[in-house]
Amino acid sequence: MTASVVAEATEVTRVIPHRFPVLLVDQVTEVVTGHHLSARKAVSANEPCYGHLGPDQPASELEYPSMLLVESWGQAAVLLAAWDHPTSDVRSGRIDLAGAIERVRFLRPVRPGSVLEHRVRMVRAVGDTAILAGETLVGGETVMEIGHFVVALRPVADLVPGGTVSTGTDGGR
């Protein structure tokens, strides 16, 4: 069965502030607000992480970096936590802060050509803080499990002295 697409990358960027080359979610295929979300990321040999490799690299060097696998799943988790409260601009509104992650297990390598299927479940939400869990699959096989991931959605004004964020055009003032 093929999952229908709920949101493409352009819609994803309306919910979270990530942009290329840091946006690591291509599609949201299912979302039940406050409960669960499924998202996809296609891993390509054109990813920036492979830019330094030559044409004759051993397969082990083509493994998708585990930190990017976690980041991609984490972006899907933030999408679930923030779905009803989009934050596409980190200079205003709220910012998504990763607080903790535990019980991460990598079960098999991911290589270019793989399509990651992130499954995220809301374990608990308290105010603007969410605890999430889930896994990533490739071809129906689990490649990574996340026991708990904590994300906090905080007003930018609470995090920046004076409550304003530089746009980069004012010399940092």
Residue ranges and their predicted role:
Residues 54-80, 98:
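Compact, glycine-rich, soluble single-domain proteins
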Residues 3-6, 77-117, 144-146, 151:
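Hydrophobic beta-strand-centered segment that forms part of the acyl-chain substrate-binding groove
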Residues 26-29, 102, 107, 121-123, ...:
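Conserved positions in beta-strands of structured domains
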Residues 20-64:
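Catalytic strand-loop segment that frames the active site of acyl-thioester-processing enzymes
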Residues 2-5, 110-173:
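HotDog/MaoC-like acyl-thioester-processing domains
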Residues 8, 21-24, 69:
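Short N-terminal amphipathic alpha-helix/helix-capping patch enriched in small hydrophobics
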Residues 7-19:
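Short aromatic-glycine motifs in intrinsically disordered, low-complexity regions
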